[in-house]
Amino acid sequence: MNILELSQKRFSVRKYSDTPVSEEDLQYILEVTRMAPSAVNKQPWKFVVVKSEAARKQLQECYDRDWFKSAPLYIICMREVDSNWIRKEDNKQHGDIDVAIATEHLCLAATERGLGSCWVCNFNVAKLKETFPYTGFEPVAIISIGHIADDCPTNEKKRKTLEEITDII
């Protein structure tokens, strides 16, 4: 599958089967994530793999949705607070951007392996920080990963046209 096909195939999965994610698939996904670019090669990230039953239950308390509980695996995507490249002109920090780039690499790698994923950003930040304390890091997103359930709801992918989002000058 090429990158366009992966992008077209990937969607936000909100129902997973009971089949666990293989260690081989997980390691592949993590390696693709590791290879993502970042501003000035700072790599200001940490990816916390949540797969034990106890840790999964704790994480589910940080985002209490029924569909979320069906995922066999989660990855908490974190930004290193003091290791962001900062643009001098306007002091814009690029850490969240860098983590987002790596996280989308993660999601596309999961798709390539026949797995589904879903970005979650509307979690209880304070509870997550308390439950999974990583000094010097802050959570940016949680990605649920797993095999897509046969009865997983899907929506038609709606995207703006190229004309709406681009200018060629």
Where would I find each of the regions flagged by the language model?
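Short coil/turn connectors at secondary-structure junctions
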Residues: 69-73, 115, 136-140
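C-terminal helix-cap and adjacent tail motif
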Residues: 3-20, 141-169
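Short secondary-structure junction motifs
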Residues: 42-45, 112-115, 140
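Glycine/small-residue-rich phosphate/adenosyl-binding loop
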Residues: 25, 30-31, 35-102
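Acidic, glycine-rich active-site loops and adjacent beta-strand->loop/helix elements
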Residues: 81-82, 123-126, 149
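Small-aliphatic-rich amphipathic alpha-helix that forms the alpha element of a beta-alpha
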Residues: 33, 75, 90-131, 143
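Short proline/glycine-enriched turn/loop segments at secondary-structure junctions
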Residues: 129-135, 153-156
